[in-house]
Structures are given as structure tokens and as C-alpha cells.
Amino acid sequence: MNRRGFMSAESHYLNALEALDEGDRERAKAESKKATSLDPEHLEAWSVYVEACLPPAPTPPTMIQAAQALAAVKKIVAADPSRMDMWVRGGRLMADDLGML
């Protein structure tokens, strides 16, 4: 927290990581969204958001979950085209879950 009592993007990101580790995907999604609202270029927070949008394996995501994850993947790749992990994740979401290929 900063001097005014507001949490930083990094604090929200760390809370999101903790929530994801605990299996609380909704809280992870909310915390990572707060982090990216404060810092839209926080690519690791966007990565946590991608993971939080998707159910744990082997459960397939719903169309809404896959679309939310893909939207975040696109933001990451736009900011850092070298993120091969996100190119692969996006391709799998499009082909396997959204039936776009």
C-alpha cells in the first residue's frame, strides 16, 4: 500500500497470484483486473488474468471463459510480441476452445 492507503498494481498482482495458488479463480481474476486497471502494461498480471479466466484442467472452458482469456492474451502479445507462451496459448484457445481455426 502507498501512503494514501491505496494498493499498488504490484500488490494486487501478488494477491492475484496467491488467490490462484489457493484455487480461488474469481478472486485471482478480480485482483489481476485491479492490477491491470492501475497498470495496463503489467503483463504478468494479465498472464494471471488469463489463467484465472480458465477452469483447471481437464475441464474445458466455456465460450465466455475462453473469449475473456483470449482478449487478455491479445493484450499481452500486442505489448510484447516475443511472448511465445501467449502466442501458443492464444492459438490453442482459438483452435481448441473457440473453434476458430
Q: Each predicted region: which residue ranges?
A:
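TPR-adjacent "capping" and linker segments in tetratricopeptide-repeat scaffold/adaptor proteins
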Residues: 1-11
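Structural signature of tandem alpha-helical TPR/SEL1-like repeats
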Residues: 22-31, 57-75, 97-101
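Short, charge-rich amphipathic alpha-helical segments embedded
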Residues: 34-55
